[in-house]
């Protein structure tokens, strides 16, 4: 922590920092910072009235070693002291290939003129759910829609991904709900139930059923526009969830229907699901509970045999499959699992779309993907690889003020997002937060239209699975084969 001499010793940084980094030394009459406590959230830097603070990389590092890195050494020391599992938050920061950045989008030139989105209509709406294999007409020749499966209608192919009430604050949830309603998209409750105040946003809400069944009851199931069964999460495939008792207080515990102060532990498996047949029973139980009026989503992590898994899920009766990739975010996960388990969403998506098409069941389900969707360009590339829509979470949190300090698990978020401390929660204004989310998604929608028009395409549906619109660069032949795209120049 670097402090400029123009510091006025107003002590605002001391007041704003929940990690107790700053304090006033009355003896020397100066402000002092404890660098070991700093999580790099930039709260103090942002609020300093004279811009006297700057966070810089420390020079107090171990000798350079590509194998035994500074982080590795610190983690070994920490485990030697505690004997515990290392916990981390957000998505994996490891230097793994980011395939979005190795894919380039096509553009029309000369023979296939581009479309100007400012002057021509561009369709960004998408419908998620099972589609008919053929158009059916009634006796009068009109299209018969009476037997169509329930659909989610989105104004653009983006939704706010699952983040539970408890993992994030009341004000963060309210911001997401308000923005989803204004945008004509959906937000996901996560596995912590739905706060009583947010039932009013039910038409733009996806309610989630996870292995812990927290906050699940008949009214909850019928409150949303869709139900998502969480089988896995990209940041921690194969394990359950854990909300510490320090966050399970007040409305959080009441919403989850658990004793206040108790840890909310979701088991690794659903104890009633050990096969596709078991999953089918739950899917149809949920359909019965909602009188077949809402689509059922099954969410899984992107793992090694994901194509075969999605093939089974498509046959379970699910209407939508959500796939969460290796870089997906989380409020807390074991570090070793977050950084070493699962596969990138780009490869998983391409493999699943191909498998479902080959088996002739692609129209039976919609595919929604998440796991580090960072921009409108990532959305376009995902659609071209076969997705119907994308989940975003980390980008949405950044719009709310998250500075990616990766300390969600400690519950002292200085921006009022990943905390239940009332003094910190009130730092996030839901009205301002929802407007920032609306601004972000509006900007993405404009960019999506621009890129579609540049390709000479006027609808999302025309782009879905159209891998001719993509070219790879710097990828191996095997990677190109799995992605189903040609190399740049071909």
What role is predicted for each listed range?
Residues 1, 21, 30, 36, ...:
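Conserved, well-structured core domains of diverse proteins
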Residues 5, 9, 36, 40, ...:
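Catalytic cores of large soluble enzymes that bind and process phosphate-bearing ligands
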Residues 9, 14-15, 19, 24-30, ...:
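Glycine-rich phosphate/ribose-binding loops and adjacent secondary-structure elements
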Residues 43, 175-182, 278-285, 312, ...:
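Alpha-helical scaffold segments in soluble metabolic enzymes
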Residues 57, 63-110, 330-346, 354-366, ...:
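Conserved active-site-proximal phosphate/metal-binding subdomains
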Residues 156-161, 183-185, 203-205, 225-229, ...:
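Structural beta-strand/beta-sheet cores of well-ordered domains, especially the beta-sheet scaffolds
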Residues 227-276, 281, 288:
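Active-site cores of enzymes that catalyze phosphoryl transfer or operate on phosphate-rich substrates
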């Amino acid at each position: 922590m670097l402090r400029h001499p123009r510091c006025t010793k107003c002590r605002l940084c001391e007041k704003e920092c929940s990690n107790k980094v700053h304090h006033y030394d009355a003896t020397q009459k100066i402000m002092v910072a404890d660098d070991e406590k700093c999580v790099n959230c930039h709260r103090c830097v942002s609020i300093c009235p004279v811009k006297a603070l700057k966070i810089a990389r420390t020079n107090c590092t171990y000798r350079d070693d590509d194998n035994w890195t500074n982080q590795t050494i610190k983690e070994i020391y920490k485990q030697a002291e505690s004997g515990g599992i290392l916990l981390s938050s957000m998505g994996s920061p490891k230097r793994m290939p980011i395939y979005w950045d190795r894919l380039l989008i096509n553009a029309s030139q000369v023979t296939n003129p581009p479309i100007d989105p400012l002057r021509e209509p561009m369709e960004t709406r998408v419908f998620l759910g099972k589609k008919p294999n053929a158009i059916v007409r009634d006796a009068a020749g009109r299209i018969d829609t009476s037997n169509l499966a329930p659909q989610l209608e989105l104004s653009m192919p983006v939704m706010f991904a699952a983040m539970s009430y408890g993992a994030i604050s009341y004000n963060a949830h309210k911001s997401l709900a308000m923005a989803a309603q204004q945008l004509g998209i959906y937000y996901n409750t996560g596995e912590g139930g739905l706060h009583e105040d947010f039932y009013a946003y039910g038409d733009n809400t996806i309610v989630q059923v996870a292995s812990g069944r927290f906050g699940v009851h008949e009214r909850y199931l019928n409150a949303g526009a869709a139900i998502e069964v969480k089988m896995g999460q990209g940041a921690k495939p194969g394990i359950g969830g854990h909300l510490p008792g320090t966050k399970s207080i007040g409305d959080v515990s009441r919403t989850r229907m658990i004793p206040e102060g108790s840890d909310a532990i979701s088991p690794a498996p659903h104890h009633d699901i050990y096969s596709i047949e078991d999953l089918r029973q739950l899917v149809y139980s949920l359909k019965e509970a909602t009188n077949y009026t809402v689509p059922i989503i099954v969410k899984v992590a992107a793992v090694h045999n994901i194509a075969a898994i999605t093939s089974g899920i498509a046959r379970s009766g699910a209407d939508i499959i959500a796939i969460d990739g290796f870089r997906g975010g989380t409020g807390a996960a074991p570090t070793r699992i977050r950084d070493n388990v699962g596969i990138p969403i780009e490869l998983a998506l391409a493999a699943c779309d191909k498998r479902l098409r080959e088996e002739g069941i692609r129209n039976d389900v919609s595919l929604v993907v998440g796991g580090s969707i960072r921009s409108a360009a990532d959305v376009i590339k995902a659609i071209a690889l076969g997705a119907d829509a994308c989940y975003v979470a980390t980008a949405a949190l950044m719009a709310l003020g998250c500075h990616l300090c990766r300390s969600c698990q400690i519950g002292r978020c200085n921006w009022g997002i990943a905390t239940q401390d009332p003094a910190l929660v009130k730092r996030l204004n839901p009205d301002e937060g929802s407007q920032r989310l609306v601004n972000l998604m509006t900007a993405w929608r404009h960019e999506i239209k621009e890129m579609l028009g540049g390709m000479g395409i006027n609808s999302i549906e025309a782009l879905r699975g159209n891998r001719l619109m993509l070219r790879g660069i710097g990828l191996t032949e095997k990677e190109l084969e799995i992605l189903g795209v040609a190399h740049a120049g071909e």
